[in-house]
Amino acid sequence: MKYFIQKALGKRTFRKPRIAVCVPSGVTEVEKKAVEDATYQAGAREVSIIEEPIAAAIGAGIDISKPCGNMIVDIGGGTSDIAVISLGGTVVSASIKIAGDDFDEAIVRYMRKKHNLLIGERTAEDLKIKIGSCYKRAEVDYMDVRGRNLVTGLPKTVKVSSEETEEALRETTAQIVETIHSVLE
């Protein structure tokens, strides 16, 4: 934490900064206090703890103070936060440890199983970002993916469709959708 504060401020500051830290919606008060204490120890003057779905809603331009419910699904790298927000606070929420990194791993497994192709996490993430889909789309996109052929050990290029990414991500997506349903109930 201290490293990031110094990196953001450089050597030009004389005052300790005010810092907002985002935490997943499911963290306990003890965990929030630990994050707050660590931030103070790293050099903060003032610390605000904000739940990630609230920060995501504000970042998306949603007026969270209104008396209407807004569902936020924040899929990060390591966790996904699902929340219903109204009147400036969280009405109901859930946080699961299934997120973007799991999508990448699912794509790596799919490419290995379906195409006998070994690809790295970076290639999987690139594929996810460029043509990844969690539902069948009217227009199918394609991308050439390079990796190592697991049979010959030689480099190989495979043309992958957005339909294949939907298949690769189906199970992981279903777990997030299941959590969305539980939040709505």
How would you name each of these model-derived features?
Residues 1-75, 83-185:
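Nucleotide/phosphate-binding catalytic cleft detector across ATP-hydrolyzing
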